[in-house]
């Protein structure tokens, strides 16, 4: 399947699932392809045929944007190494879940979460350790007794009860033994970031007014490989912010406004060479001098809202 077709299929799935989907934008390199939101959830998606093409830098950028939008990063692809991604299986690239298109459909449209995750050595499942312990104790089985039934050591059974995953074969053997389910589904929305440092070491040159904005009482989070150069936060407001010449930001104003609509945020472009205040769609176009002349963050919010 071509990259474009895969992206179109992903967009169709998210629309079928009731999500509003951002426009596709032409920009290289880019940390994400589309953002989907339904008023409650935001999913930032990177669509790429071979998931091994994702670098740590790509993953960090994707994770940073998703977390700062209170959303979830997700990779959708077709292959890993020399094999196709399995339907119903979750792969992980730098802490970010990666799945194929059918798994995306199952989760978001059919409300059927994946059960399997890929790890070095094969495919595995998570089991409920607490449920396993209850079943074992109800049958008055010791750790060793259950280990003999399953063909594993008592120490391994103890690890299962402590939350360690297991092979599909062992999990099915457990369920057959107790005639009860112990396999836990994987919630794609509940992934946790492995990147403990939210910012790159350097501050991008594109945001030279960062210090001035922060002196006004707002927080600025630089963004990389995105249509907007920063997220500006104040109180409950998030502003997707572009910065540069009027010609440069005018080309991005439309997609920034579109993403702000999907994510229920605001949009602003700060122009370095034009002080004429105006709007392009949802995006406030404001001159750099005009922005820095504002006294309070509320003054900016009022300009954006009015």
Swiss-Prot record:
DNA-binding residues (ranges): 143-162
The keyword Transcription is assigned to this record: yes
Cleaved signal peptide residues: none
Keywords: DNA-binding, Transcription, Transcription regulation
Residues annotated as domain HTH cro/C1-type: 132-189
The keyword Transcription regulation appears for this protein: yes
InterPro entries, per database record: Arc_TR_HTH, Cro/C1-type_HTH, Lambda_DNA-bd_dom_sf
SMART domains assigned to the protein according to its UniProt record, in alphabetical order: HTH_XRE
GO MF annotations, alphabetized: DNA binding; DNA-binding transcription factor activity
HAMAP family documented for this protein: HTH_type_cro_C1
Identification of the protein by name: Putative HTH-type transcriptional regulatory protein Mhun_2548
């Amino acid at each position: 399947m071509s990259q474009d077709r895969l992206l179109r299929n992903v967009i169709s799935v998210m629309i079928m699932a009731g999500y509003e989907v951002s426009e596709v934008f032409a920009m290289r390199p880019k940390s994400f392809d589309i953002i989907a939101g339904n008023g409650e959830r935001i999913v930032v998606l990177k669509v790429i045929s071979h998931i091994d093409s994702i670098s740590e830098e790509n993953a960090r950028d994707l994770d940073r944007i998703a977390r700062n939008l209170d959303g979830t990063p997700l990779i959708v692809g077709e292959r890993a190494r020399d094999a196709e991604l399995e339907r119903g299986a979750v792969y992980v690239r730098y802490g970010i879940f990666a799945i194929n298109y059918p798994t995306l459909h199952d989760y978001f449209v059919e409300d059927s979460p994946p059960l399997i995750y890929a790890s070095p050595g094969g495919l595995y499942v998570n089991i409920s350790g607490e449920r396993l312990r209850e079943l074992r104790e109800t049958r008055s089985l010791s750790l060793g007794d259950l280990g003999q039934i399953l063909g594993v050591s008592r120490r391994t059974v103890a690890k299962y009860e402590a939350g360690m995953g297991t092979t599909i074969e062992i999990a099915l053997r457990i369920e057959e033994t107790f005639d009860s389910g112990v396999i836990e589904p994987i919630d794609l929305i509940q992934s946790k970031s492995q990147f403990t440092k939210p910012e790159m070491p350097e501050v991008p040159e594109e945001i030279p007014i960062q210090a001035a904005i922060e002196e006004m009482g707002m927080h600025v989070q630089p963004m990389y490989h995105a249509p907007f150069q920063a997220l500006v936060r104040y109180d409950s407001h998030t502003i997707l912010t572009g910065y540069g010449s009027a010609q440069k930001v005018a080309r991005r104003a439309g997609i920034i406004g579109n993403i702000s609509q999907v994510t229920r945020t605001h949009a602003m472009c700060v122009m370095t060479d034009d002080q004429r205040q105006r709007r392009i769609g949802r995006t406030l176009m404001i001159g750099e001098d005009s922005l820095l002349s504002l006294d309070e963050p509320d003054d900016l919010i009022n300009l954006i809202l009015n």
